Amino acid sequence: MSAIKDHYKQMLDEYHIVWEERQHTEELILNADEVVKSPGIPGDAPMMLKIQEKGIPVISEIEFAGRYTDAKMVCITGSNGKTTTTSLIYHIFKSAGYNVGLAGNIGQSLAYQVATCDYDYYIIELSSFQLDNMYEFRANIAILLNITPDHLDRYNYNMQEYVDAKFRILQNQTDDDAFIFWNDDPIIQRELSKHGIHAKLYPFAEDKREGVMAYTDSDELYFTAPYAFNMEQEELALTGKHNLYNSMAAGISASLSGIGKEVIREALSTFRGVEHRLEYVARVRGVDYINDSKATNVNSCWYALQSMTQKTILIIGGKDKGNDYTEIADLVREKCVGLIYMGLHNEKLHEFFDPFGLPVADVQSMKDAVDAAYRMAKSGEAVLLSPCCASFDLFKSYEDRGEQFKACVRAL
């Protein structure tokens, strides 16, 4: 249990909300009518088990706040791309002059904004952990970007439990609502018939086919409904194949919300990327340093490696969540000229990647990782921090990990 930051204490005091830190007063919690749980707390934590034993309802902050607003909810989930797509949609809505808030895993809490603002729309990034404790909340537009193995340590290493959590974004939707999804995702395709979907379907795909609302053809990105338009891929602010899909999802959601095609096209071309996601840091002695600290699972790293055009030193490692590195094996062989294992327990990385015959280094701090990469990289190559893992073995968060990386690079 950690301390509360000073500015949050000040805010709690301002609103006369009782708080405590570094402890839980069991008597108070177990006498509650309802518990709002932070998504980072696992369901098998000792206090949570006591709450369950007493039969006290447990909800997420999103579920709680959603009771007190009639605003339209545009909700985004998926294993990868959530933050980028959420930020991109928010950028489009703001560009259109909409009265809109940004919440969920990004921005201020939904509860704080509902209490202090009067927005017409909220763009909400939802993790599987948040969805687990949502029951009556309704997304007017639900977006499911993709599903790949992630957080399996929180789901009994059972992929179906994780998949079911992601599909909770559809609960309570009606035929007035919209479900936007990646049509090429095999898991999503397999699951569609299982979940009794009531919303209208708006799939997007890599190629043109019947029924898709956005697709690519040659170097163009096409939107078919409700406002048909196209734009050249090179006009998009975000690069990489994965960002084509993120842009499709964002464009469809904006179109469905009444935003015109010219505004959407302009916003897709002016968006500035998300910090810690394929973020260019600096070029040092001819070597480019890229911060992809937000890549906390293998699939995120796959997208990052796929986008690399230079030979790459990959910094990988952290708190393993049941990772299967097979997904990136071919890309590591093709793109990488060295590996830096950064973590307290790197045995699994050694076992999987050492047979590739690449130069490797073991480190337990960001400074050592950057120094090792600096020694290993040659002019014209790149150093990519894309860890595949959670950050909590050596860092406070993925943001802390990314900030340390940038600071160490700039100190070279």
Q: Which residues fall in each region the model found?
A:
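Glycine-rich, highly charged phosphate/nucleotide-binding loops
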Residues: 13-28
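Nucleotide phosphate-binding/pyrophosphate-handling subdomain across enzymes
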Residues: 231-336
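Phosphate-binding loop of NTP-binding sites
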Residues: 26-32, 39-183, 187-199, 393, ...
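C-terminal helical cap/extension that packs against the catalytic core
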Residues: 9-13, 326-381
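NAD(P)-binding Rossmann-fold cofactor-contacting core
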Residues: 1-9
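Beta-strand->loop->alpha-helix junctions that form or flank phosphate-binding loops
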Residues: 20-23, 59-63, 196-216, 267-269, ...
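Short active-site oxyanion
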Residues: 32-34, 98-100, 174-179, 286-289, ...
